[in-house]
Regions:
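An N-terminal boundary/leader segment
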Residues: 1-59
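Conserved hydrophobic/aromatic pocket- or pore-lining residues that grip, position, or stack substrates
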Residues: 36, 58, 80, 86, ...
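Short alpha-helical functional segments enriched in proximate histidine and acidic residues
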Residues: 39, 43, 61, 65, ...
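Long amphipathic alpha-helix in the N-terminal Rossmann-like dinucleotide-binding domain
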Residues: 56-63, 122-123, 132
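Enzymes and membrane/adaptor proteins characterized by extended Gly/Ser/Thr/Asp/Glu-rich
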Residues: 77-114
Length: 190
């Protein structure tokens, strides 16, 4: 199975196009988030790119964003834009497994700076993306998650510790995907 997309599908639109469409009321953050979630629902059983995918939480954020756009008061340039964020970037209240079954799952006390900036800008945090144990394996192999798969060839992995984010980006799980890189974590999936 290979992923084939039309660039006119809502889940595949770039962030700047979404913001322009929200501003003109041609699209709403809710309908875009619903389209992204439907696309993720179709592909996630094959790709294993996400951790903590919570559709209702994402839709709640999208509804709040929609109200801000209707009032002409978006929080920032990313308001309503669906985004994934790598699981090693703490989000308040969520466990941070670091890709390994060896850590105790305890909720993060606060957002890490990248997550905080995304929330301040109104971004819709759709899901966390998977990573290998401690972000240390270029293969993407994890003792906590199933191996993330390349949407263009499901027999392969994107590789790198941002393998989940790389798979999510290539599959069109929305326009923005936040990862981290020290030794190739973003560059390998790219």
């Amino acid at each position: 199975m290979a992923l084939h997309l039309s660039p006119t599908q809502l889940h595949d639109l770039p962030a700047h196009t979404l913001v322009e469409a929200y501003r003109s009321r041609a699209l709403s953050p809710v309908e875009v988030t619903q389209a992204v979630l439907a696309h993720i629902d179709r592909w996630e059983p094959h790709l294993h790119a996400t951790y903590l995918l919570r559709p209702e939480h994402a839709l709640e954020q999208a509804r709040a964003s929609e109200q801000r756009w209707l009032q002409g008061a978006p929080l920032g340039t990313l308001d309503g834009v669906p985004t994934t964020i790598k699981e090693n970037i703490a989000t308040q209240g969520d466990p941070v497994p670091l890709g390994t079954a060896a850590v105790t799952l305890a909720p993060a006390a606060a957002d890490a700076p990248p997550a905080a900036r995304l929330r301040e800008a109104g971004s819709v945090l759709v899901a966390k993306t998977t990573m290998p144990d401690y972000g240390m394996l270029s293969s993407g192999l994890s003792s906590f998650h199933a191996l993330a798969r390349n949407p263009w060839d499901l027999r392969t992995t994107p590789g790198g510790s941002s393998a989940g984010g790389g798979a999510a980006a290539a599959a069109g799980y929305g326009p923005l995907h936040i990862g981290t890189d020290i030794g190739g974590s973003l560059r390998l999936p790219a």
